[in-house]
Every structure is written in structure tokens, then in C-alpha cells.
């Protein structure tokens, strides 16, 4: 059974790629067509690869794998934090700090510092310090929480990393490759499939597309750990509306209606 329908993918705008002039030729097998200078992703391929990614992630979660979600672009940051938290995973949704994985020992000292200041705050010690010192520590705490809050409970390197926007997160990709940590990623038409162990051809710029794909991967982790999905959890967006249409014609019509491509799609 497919974890997502073609109408759901279409409604979320998963099919909108980048300008054809910016494509990576390695993505040719996953491109359906070009219209008005924009590449259109083959949603049949997306559904197939999402099914494979779902099973890969679910089976990993069953084995006790710990996952790290990475997505620092504005459109992805909130989704990454929400979905990672929902399925009990770690996340980086601000700036990727150099050496976050390859220099884990040093990053761990900064996490320890974050926890130290948090303890000072919860114990009331900060309130008893001189105002200037307390203000300095609160600023330090805010900065550490911003960049490391999503991984402060991570005791060791993750077993797999889920990445939104391979090109933007190039440093994270290279660190994973160096450490042989499996990469699961959304691949837009300007990406390189050779840099991912598991990938899903998808628009990686539109909020609804990111929400749909990342949400399904979070579902897979949750299902792998708990044996079933929690039906109380509902997506923020409604992707379930049934549409009676010829998908091929509709995809092309959507693109022809766009003068500059999907308004949510980056250049």
C-alpha cells in the first residue's frame, strides 16, 4: 500500500522543480517534463521512492536507530523542529555548525555548557547573580539553545540523517559521507542522487511539499518505534482531498498557468 497518493503529491506542489537551466543531469530519470523553463518532477517516481524511503526508515526505527533531521532554510525550519520532535528525533534547523558531526567531541562540550546554564536557571542561581553576569549568561543560553537545542539530548552520532535541500546543507552531507552515516534526502532537480543513500525526488522549497514528505518520514519513525501510527496526530495541512483528474494533463496545466513557476519555489 502506498504511503501517499499522486493527488496528495500534486496538491502539495511536490512536482515543481527548479529552472531547467539549473538542473543536475543526474536527475534526468526523475523528471517528467519541462514547461515554461521549469522542470516537472515525475510524481510516479516520487511515490515509488517515498515508499522505499518509508520502509527503510521504519525498519531502521524498529532496530533502534536514532535519526537527525536537518533543514535550515526558512521554509523548512519550523517543519523540521515539529516533525522531529513528534517522532522523538533530533534536529538542526538553524545554522549547521562546522564539525557538528565530524568534531562531535567539541560540539558535545558546548551541549554540556548549554545544560549547565539551564541548570543554573532552573535552580534559581541566575537570579542571584549580579545583573550583568546574569544577562551575559542568558544571552549565551539563548544562542546555545538556538543552534544546539535540537540535539541537546543526543548522546552519540545519529544512525541516519534526513536532509531537506542537499545543496544548502552541503556541509552536513559531506560530514555524513565522511563518517559513513546514511543520508535520506529530498532531491530537487538541481541535486545529485549519488550523494544520498536513500532519496525522494521532490520539490524541496515549497512549504507544503516539505511538510508532506518530511511528515511521512516522521510517521515511519513513529511507526517503527511504536508499532503503529498515533491517529491523534494530524497534519497541519489537509492532503487527503480526493481529486478526480487526469494527473498528466493537470500537471502540465498547472505549470502553464505559472508565469514564473511555483511562487513557493526557490530560484
Curated annotation (Swiss-Prot):
GO terms for cellular component: cytosolic small ribosomal subunit. It holds the Pfam family Ribosomal_S2. The keyword Ribonucleoprotein applies. GO terms for biological process: translation. CDD domains: RPS2 (cd01425). It comes from the Bacteria. Keywords: Ribonucleoprotein, Ribosomal protein. InterPro entries: Ribosomal_uS2, Ribosomal_uS2_bac/mit/plastid, Ribosomal_uS2_CS, Ribosomal_uS2_flav_dom_sf. Residues 247-267 are annotated as: Disordered. Transmembrane segments: none annotated. One of its GO terms (molecular function) is structural constituent of ribosome. Belongs to the universal ribosomal protein uS2 family. This is Small ribosomal subunit protein uS2.
Amino acid at each position: 500500500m502506498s504511503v501517499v497518493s499522486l493527488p496528495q503529491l500534486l496538491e502539495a506542489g511536490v512536482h515543481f522543480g527548479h529552472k531547467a537551466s539549473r538542473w543536475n543531469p543526474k536527475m534526468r530519470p526523475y523528471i517528467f517534463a519541462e514547461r515554461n523553463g521549469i522542470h516537472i518532477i515525475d510524481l510516479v517516481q516520487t511515490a515509488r521512492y517515498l515508499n522505499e524511503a518509508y520502509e527503510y526508515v521504519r525498519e531502521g526505527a524498529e532496530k533502534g536507530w536514532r535519526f537527525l533531521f536537518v533543514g535550515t532554510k526558512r521554509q523548512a525550519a519550523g517543519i523540521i523542529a515539529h516533525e522531529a520532535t513528534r517522532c522523538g528525533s533530533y534536529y538542526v534547523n538553524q545554522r549547521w555548525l562546522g564539525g557538528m558531526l565530524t568534531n562531535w567531541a567539541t560540539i558535545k562540550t558546548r551541549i554540556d555548557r548549554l545544560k549547565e546554564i539551564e541548570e543554573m536557571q532552573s535552580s534559581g542561581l541566575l537570579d542571584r547573580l549580579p545583573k550583568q553576569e546574569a544577562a551575559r549568561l542568558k544571552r549565551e543560553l539563548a544562542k546555545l539553545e538556538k543552534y544546539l537545542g535540537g540535539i541537546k539530548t543526543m548522546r552519540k552520532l545519529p544512525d541516519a540523517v534526513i536532509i531537506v535541500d542537499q545543496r544548502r546543507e552541503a556541509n552536513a552531507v559531506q560530514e555524513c559521507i565522511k563518517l559513513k552515516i546514511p543520508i535520506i534526502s529530498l532531491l530537487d532537480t538541481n541535486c545529485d542522487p549519488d550523494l544520498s543513500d536513500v532519496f525522494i525526488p521532490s520539490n524541496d522549497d515549497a512549504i507544503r511539499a516539505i511538510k508532506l514528505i518530511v511528515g511521512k518520514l516522521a510517521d515511519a519513525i513513529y511507526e517503527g518505534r511504536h508499532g503503529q501510527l498515533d491517529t491523534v496526530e494530524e497534519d497541519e495541512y489537509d492532503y487527503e482531498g480526493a481529486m478526480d483528474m487526469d494527473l498528466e494533463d493537470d500537471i502540465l496545466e498547472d505549470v502553464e498557468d505559472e508565469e514564473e513557476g511555483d511562487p513557493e519555489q526557490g530560484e
